[in-house]
Amino acid sequence: MLTGKLIHPDIMAALALCGHGDKVLIADGNYPLDSKSGQAETVYLGLTPGLPTVTDVLQAIQSAVNIEKAEVMDPADGTTPEIFGQFQSMLGGMELSKLGRYEFYDACCQPGVRLAISTGEKRTFANLLVTIGVA
């Protein structure tokens, strides 16, 4: 039996193939994963509305890899979603790079995005693109 926090076999396999600088998208339930994740390995985790959350998945991912950068989709109206503060807290105060909606979509379609995970997250703008750091 596995004893770590991350036990999903497809996510573990995809992360094992990642190297420094590769990226992982953790998407909310509203994100158009099929059309806006390029050639990334896709994993659909949404079980029910709200489960799992993006922060649940981030916590599991952090138990397996180091994260050196985080990018978020910034609302056009200039508001800051509450979840951005949660991301920063979970990432040790790391500054979030804010991208406009279409800029974020473009970033998620780049070849370096190796894994895209869809969640049941209901909060809007709860999408997170993380860059894997060194071990």
PLM ranges: what are they?
Residues 74, 79-135:
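Glycine-rich, aromatic-bearing surface loops/beta-hairpins
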Residues 36-69:
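A phosphate-binding glycine/aspartate-rich beta-alpha loop in the early core of alpha/beta enzymes
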Residues 1-40, 44-47:
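Long, hydrophobic N-terminal alpha-helical segment
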Residues 2, 6, 10, 19, ...:
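Conserved active-site and cofactor/substrate-binding residues in soluble primary-metabolism enzymes
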Residues 1-2, 45, 70-77, 114-115:
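Flexible, glycine/proline-enriched loop segments at strand-loop-helix junctions
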Residues 4-5, 61, 134-135:
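Conserved phosphate- and dinucleotide-binding cores of soluble alpha/beta proteins
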Residues 19-22, 39-40, 67, 111-113, ...:
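Short coil/turn connectors at secondary-structure junctions
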